[in-house]
């Protein structure tokens, strides 16, 4: 019996990153973790910066970093529209660590006109990239 799948498109502002049939998609929506599979109810949600994990039709997994965006689930198609999408293997761990350090330093030395919300967004993006890198390292170690 063939696995039940759904068509998934992951698109950034620059290009289509992934298009194909998947058994499942896991992302962090505005209300928490979302697991999308064949037969999921229609849904529209904001996506928080973080990891998107897909299980392809053949059972293999692929992991992406999403900087945020929108998830649309329809009966036969799932679309992820993200500002920035990076394959996990393309994330520069040192650059993410440096971005985290910079955001923390800005927050520690904040003045009266400091934009705390913008700093929190930058910190969240850096932390999300580092979580994706750690997930990949754990999967490789298995």
Curated annotation (Swiss-Prot):
Per the record, the domain of life is Bacteria
Q: Which InterPro entries match?
A: ATP_F1_dsu/esu_C_sf (IPR036794), ATP_synth_F1_dsu/esu (IPR001469), ATP_synth_F1_dsu/esu_N (IPR020546), ATP_synth_F1_esu_C (IPR020547), ATPsynth_dsu/esu_N (IPR036771)
> Sorted alphabetically, which keywords does the UniProt record give?
ATP synthesis, Cell inner membrane, Cell membrane, CF(1), Hydrogen ion transport, Ion transport, Membrane, Transport
Molecular function (GO) terms listed? Answer: ATP binding; proton-transporting ATP synthase activity, rotational mechanism
Membrane topology, from the record: Peripheral membrane protein
Q: Where in the cell is it found?
A: Cell inner membrane
Any one Pfam family here would be ATP-synt_DE_N
Quick one: a GO cellular component term?
Answer: proton-transporting ATP synthase complex
Per its UniProt record, what SUPFAM superfamilies does this chain match?
Epsilon subunit of F1F0-ATP synthase C-terminal domain, Epsilon subunit of F1F0-ATP synthase N-terminal domain
Report the sequence similarity comment from the record: Belongs to the ATPase epsilon chain family.
Describe the protein's quaternary organization and the partners it interacts with: F-type ATPases have 2 components, CF(1) - the catalytic core - and CF(0) - the membrane proton channel. CF(1) has five subunits: alpha(3), beta(3), gamma(1), delta(1), epsilon(1). CF(0) has three main subunits: a, b and c.
Note the PANTHER family from the entry.
Answer: ATP SYNTHASE DELTA/EPSILON CHAIN, ATP SYNTHASE EPSILON CHAIN, CHLOROPLASTIC
> What function is annotated for this protein?
Produces ATP from ADP in the presence of a proton gradient across the membrane.
Q: What is this protein called?
A: ATP synthase epsilon chain
């Amino acid at each position: 019996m063939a696995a039940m799948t759904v068509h998934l498109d992951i698109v950034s502002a620059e290009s289509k990153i992934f298009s194909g049939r998947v058994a499942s998609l896991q992302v962090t929506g505005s209300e928490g973790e979302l697991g999308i599979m064949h037969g999921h109810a229609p849904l529209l949600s904001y996506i928080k910066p973080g990891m998107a994990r897909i299980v392809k039709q053949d059972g293999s997994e692929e992991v992406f970093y999403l900087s945020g965006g929108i998830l649309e689930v329809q009966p036969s198609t799932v679309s992820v529209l993200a500002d920035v999408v990076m394959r996990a293997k393309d994330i520069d761990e040192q650059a993410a660590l440096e971005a985290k350090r910079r955001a923390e330093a800005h927050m520690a030395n904040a003045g009266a006109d400091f934009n705390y919300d913008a700093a929190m967004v930058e910190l969240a993006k850096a932390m999300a990239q580092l979580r994706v890198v750690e997930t990949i390292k754990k999967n490789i170690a298995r």
